[in-house]
Amino acid sequence: MRQAIMSYQNLVSEAGLTQKHLIYGDKELFQHELKTIFARNWLFLTHDSLIPSPGDYVKAKMGVDEVIVSRQNDGSVRAFLNVCRHRGKTIVDAEAGNAKGFVCGYHGWGYGSNGELQSVPFEKELYGDAIKKKCLGLKEVPRIESFHGFIYGCFDAEAPPLIDYLGDVAWYLEPTFKHSGGLELVGPPAKVVVKGNWKVFAENFVGDIYHIGWTHASILRAGQAIFAPLAGNAMLPPEGTGLQATTKYGSGIGVSLDAYSGVQSADLVPEMMAFGGAKQEKLAKEIGDVRARIYRSQVNGTVFPNNCFLTGAGVFKVFNPIDENTTEAWTYAIVEKDMPEDLKRRLADAAQRSTGPAGYWESDDNDNMVLSQNAKKYQSSNSDLIADLGFGKDVYGDECYPGVVSKSAFSETNHRGFYRAYQAHISSSNWAEFENTSRNWHTELTKTTDR
């Protein structure tokens, strides 16, 4: 066994400046991540718009576990492992639907939409009084919370409330998620399995604007809207047009200012800019010029660990781990509730064309995501990967922008924040230890010496 994974203590250096390459390909570490990352943190499940009525349900993933997310008769949302308590068979095969309950296809055990075991074939004849149905309901996800219609679940009772977990990321998201009038999620998600470690996808979304001009050069040259001047690394983004912000719990945000129409098809730009411009004027009076401008920008980001998005481009993703080298990407579209129906449809179509399974942006990115395969190689696995772009320039306590902030579009600020939190989790046995390790998180990330 290779170095017993170095006791999980030093895979990421202080301030997240370097990461051991093996974090992308080690089987033992992946199993440890399921325990310390996916069983501990808040994970995206679904959106109110996909389960609006009692009995509506969708399937979601929490790490490698599949769950049923169901709207209850009282309007609340509950989630349960999609596993029969009798012999462990998957209960629900459909991706979504409406049902009063769920019946296992193996022996016919029936559960209510509230997860309670309601019926057992030949219960009295075969079991007598031995079956304690109240004790044999589906295993429930103990914590469900919502952020402006976006529903998250968590298995850990010690985790902070969702709004605290999001931290300063919520400040950047609320102009679009709340003050715009709200969002709808367009599903079902398009799904594709990619040979890459889940973290590679998460870090790409959390703050990697640096790759756009080179990786996506051919698309940009074909006239892909706002970012076309960057094609082939022809130029840097003008100063003052972008920023990044990272948080205590690893979530991060990148803002491409005024790029509301983002990476979508050029024919959407005039209509998107007109729609967003009119709303920006209204929002400026309600939430101030700074946050109204964020609304009319493209915001890329990752809610730690694996929920990613591009607002202004209509893209919303979950990167579900399968194993240390394989990830299933789920791609939804997000649209504003008050958009004209035709614009919603076209934006959702454009989001899938660009970043769905066969998307032209997605194809470029997936070529890079397989970099994790090198983590399986003996010499490569023990090398250090660097994430020091912009280190020493980040600030905490900016007068306009919360979080640890870089005033540059090209920075690895958010990589460092993501991996600082990642290391704190994998080397901690519970939330209390994580909090103790993270008490000086912003000081660590804003050091100007000791690279």
UniProtKB/Swiss-Prot annotation:
Pfam families listed in its UniProt record: Rieske, Ring_hydroxyl_A
Catalysis performed (reactions): 2,4-dinitrotoluene + NADH + O2 = 4-methyl-5-nitrocatechol + nitrite + NAD(+)
Enzyme class at the top of the EC tree: oxidoreductase
Residues involved in Fe cation binding: H211, H216, D365
MF terms (GO), sorted A to Z: 2 iron, 2 sulfur cluster binding; iron ion binding; naphthalene 1,2-dioxygenase activity; oxidoreductase activity, acting on paired donors, with incorporation or reduction of molecular oxygen, NAD(P)H as one donor, and incorporation of two atoms of oxygen into one donor
Binding locations of [2Fe-2S] cluster: C84, H86, C104, H107
Keywords on record: 2Fe-2S, Aromatic hydrocarbons catabolism, Dioxygenase, Iron, Iron-sulfur, Metal-binding, NAD, Oxidoreductase
Role, per record: Component of the 2,4-dinitrotoluene dioxygenase (DNTDO) multicomponent enzyme system which catalyzes the incorporation of both atoms of molecular oxygen into 2,4-dinitrotoluene (DNT) to form 4-methyl-5-nitrocatechol (MNC) and nitrite. The alpha subunit has a catalytic role in the holoenzyme. Also able to convert naphthalene to cis-(1R,2S)-dihydroxy-1,2-dihydronaphthalene.
Similarity remark: Belongs to the bacterial ring-hydroxylating dioxygenase alpha subunit family.
Listed name of the protein: 2,4-dinitrotoluene dioxygenase system, large oxygenase component
